[in-house]
UniProtKB/Swiss-Prot annotation:
Pfam families: PIN. Belongs to the PINc/VapC protein family. CDD domains: PIN_MtVapC26-like. InterPro entries: PIN-like_dom_sf, PIN_dom, VapC_family. Toxic component of a type II toxin-antitoxin (TA) system. An RNase. Upon expression in M.smegmatis inhibits colony formation. Its toxic effect is neutralized by coexpression with cognate antitoxin VapB26. Its EC number is 3.1.-.-. The gene is vapC26. Mg(2+) binds at residues 4, 97. This is Ribonuclease VapC26. It is an enzyme of class 3 (hydrolase). It comes from the Bacteria. Keywords: Hydrolase, Magnesium, Metal-binding, Nuclease, Toxin-antitoxin system. It comes from Mycobacterium tuberculosis (strain ATCC 25618 / H37Rv). GO terms for biological process: negative regulation of growth. HAMAP family: VapC_Nob1.
Length: 135
């Protein structure tokens, strides 16, 4: 399962309205919990600016703890993501969402845990079809 920034923000912040639904998806998943470096960067910024450095450090330590599949994105993945950004440029999706599409292909999954239904209802898997967007 590919996990987007919005879902991780809800997971790590119990005050978020979707915290329980996202937590259930993560805590009950038998799939790898795949997180891109771009999602980590977005999450780090949001937590640091909204909540503070202590929360930021707690999130980073949790992500580094081994339960999460921290995916690598090299030049080939960035090039592939750039093609996706080009294809969907009217949607203004950005590198984080495009990398999630690339990683979904690499990990052979169509399941995306996100609260960003607008983008992921428009985006398509590289191999065709549709993503399964949860929660």
């Amino acid at each position: 399962m590919i996990i987007d920034t919005s879902a991780l923000l809800a997971y790590f912040d119990a005050a978020e309205p979707d915290h329980a639904a996202v937590s259930e998806c993560i805590d009950s998943s038998a799939d790898a919990l795949v997180v891109s470096p771009y999602v980590v960067a977005e999450l780090d910024y949001l937590v640091a600016t909204r909540v503070g450095v202590d929360a930021e450090l707690a999130v980073l330590r949790e992500l580094a703890g081994g339960a999460w599949e921290l995916a690598n994105c090299g030049a080939a993945e960035i090039e592939q993501a750039a093609r996706i950004v080009t294809k969907y440029q009217d949607q203004r999706i950005g590198i984080a969402d495009a990398a999630n599409v690339v990683l979904a292909d690499r990990y052979r999954t169509r399941t995306i845990l996100t609260l960003d239904r607008r983008h992921f209802s428009a985006l398509r898997p590289i191999g065709g079809g549709r993503f399964t967007v949860i929660p």
